[in-house]
Regions:
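Ribonuclease/tRNase effector modules and their secretory precursors
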Residues: 1-88
Length: 88
């Protein structure tokens, strides 16, 4: 599950993926860490989109919902702390 490119919307786009992640207190850098170090993958029960789970360097256990554009490119839709996890 390695991708070469992650597509980000403009930071100030209120409907963009950067803002969707920020609403949950997750930064672009944290999302990129999870993509690089994904520990598990699944399908979101609510959206039907693929998700990856992983830890950040600060110890947060995150879930990233994404769309795979092609074999090398992903578009993160949103990200948040895994429910029930003990995050710093």
């Amino acid at each position: 599950m390695r991708w070469d490119s992650i597509i980000w919307d403009l930071d100030d786009d209120p409907d963009g993926n950067v803002q969707h992640c920020a609403e949950h207190g997750v930064t672009k850098e944290e999302v990129e860490e999870v993509f690089q170090n994904a520990a598990d993958a699944d399908i979101s029960r609510s959206s039907g989109r693929p998700v990856v789970f992983g830890d950040t360097s600060t110890g947060r256990h995150l879930m990233v919902v994404y769309e795979e554009i092609d074999a090398a490119t992903v578009y993160p839709v949103t990200a948040y702390d895994v429910p029930g996890s003990q995050n710093p």
